[in-house]
Every structure is written in structure tokens, then in C-alpha cells.
Amino acid sequence: MLKLSEPQAKEYIAELAAKCDRRWKETVDKTRFMDELRAGKLKKETLQLFYKNWGSFVPVINSVYTSAFYRHLWFFVKNVDLMEVYTQKVLDEFGHPCPPGHIQILMSTGKALGLSKEEVLLSPMLPECRALPDFHRTLINDGQIQEYWFSVLWEHPFGESCLDFFKALTMHYGLSTADASYFSKHHEADTMDHLDRKSHGAVTQTVLVRLLQQGIIERPGYSAEYCAVTPADLNKMFMDGCYNATH
């Protein structure tokens, strides 16, 4: 069992978060998809295919987060104070700017990219894209409690990439700031405290600190580092799949 003091847990998580950020920079940030997006040279067809797959991913990952309360109910009942930070993210995802939440801006940015609501939400995912939500579903359903929470540390580097998306869409692809709001809002939500709530990344780290204080047992093959950095590889595969399918 790995059991740490609060300062030790915070240091451990900071190190893992830094590894996650580095892996993201080494993988996602160096894809042809992101290079061409930042330069305004990514084909619109590729961008649309990415967004259709991303639109199918979003409801899944949000539902996985809400299911965490049921799957990990024993932990939240034992640590009632953490229900507040957990609920902050639920309110953000499903209540801002009003119910049903972020899915509204997901659809509005999709519309600005020339996609219908059905294309954004109901498109079959490419196998290379399907791997990302299936990884999270596997951890929430089959894994130890900490595995899921370590696996969402990638929200912070994703939030930084959202700024790249926002800049590219408004500078090179003719979208207004309102049109591209899915990415600006997620840059804000994932990387900084906002609306008197913790950033999504801070919510995750708060839960992980408590888990490490109370002790975790790792399954063979599912170390904290593996769970934390693998989503960067899967996001790269997601982008590569969309790029290769349109070239």
C-alpha cells in the first residue's frame, strides 16, 4: 500500500502532473494535426472529422465523471467535504451557462464548423478515437479507485491545447470568439479557478491528495504514472487517426 502525508501526496501528484504535461508536449503538441492547426494549414475536413469524434467523446467522458460518485460512493461518504469540490465540476459541466451546460457550446462551435447537431453528437467514432473513452470506461468500471482519478490529470494540458484551438479557429478559420467558445471556455475551466469554483484539474488533484493520504493499492500494470500519462498517447492517436483518415 502507498500511503503518504498531505505534503508528500501533493509533491507526488505535482510530479505526476508534470510528467503528464511533458508527455503531452512530446506527443500531442508534436502531431502534424496540431502543427498544421496552429499554422492555419489543417484541412477543414480534418478539423471537422476531429470535432465529430470529439463530440461523440464528450458525453461519454462526462457520464464517466458522474458515475464516479456512484462507483466511489464509499469514498465520498467517508470524505463528505470532498462532495463540494466534486459537485463544483458537475455544476460547471452540466449547469454553465445554464442546463444542460457545456454541451450547448459544444454544439454551437460545431455549427460554426459546418456540422449539424447530429453530426457532432451521434457520429460513429474512429477506432483510433474510440480508444480514449474506452480507456476511461475501463478504469472506472474495472480499476482501483485512484486509477480513474490519475487518468484525468490530462485535463490541464488539454486546457492549454484548447487555447491553441481557439487562436487557430479565430485567426485562420473565420470563427468569431463566440463561435470558438467551446475551446476558450475549456481553456478557462481546465486550467484556472473560475466562477468561484476550482479548475477541473484542481478538483482532480484535491481528490487524489486525500486518496493518497488514506492509502492506495496499485494493480500490476496500472501504476499511477501509467494511468496519468497514457491519455496523452491516446489523444495523439485520436488526432493521428483523424489526420490519416483525411489525407
Residue ranges and their predicted role:
Residues 2-13, 38-51, 141-146, 181-185:
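Short, charged, low-complexity loops and linkers
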Residues 2-3, 15-45, 61-65, 131, ...:
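Short alpha-helical hairpin
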Residues 3-4, 200, 204, 209-247:
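Acidic, carboxylate-rich catalytic segments that either coordinate divalent cations
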Residues 12-15, 19-22, 84-188, 233-237, ...:
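Active-site-proximal alpha-helical scaffolds that flank and shape metal-associated catalytic sites
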Residues 22-26, 41-75, 146-165, 232-239:
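Alpha-helical bundle segments that constitute or directly flank the non-heme di-iron/ferroxidase center
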Residues 46-49, 53-60, 78-85, 98-102, ...:
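Short, contiguous, pocket-lining structural segments
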Residues 73-77, 117, 177, 217-222:
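Structural helix-adjacent loops and short alpha-helical linkers that scaffold large soluble proteins
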Residues 182-208:
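Glycine/small-residue-rich hydrophobic helix-like segments
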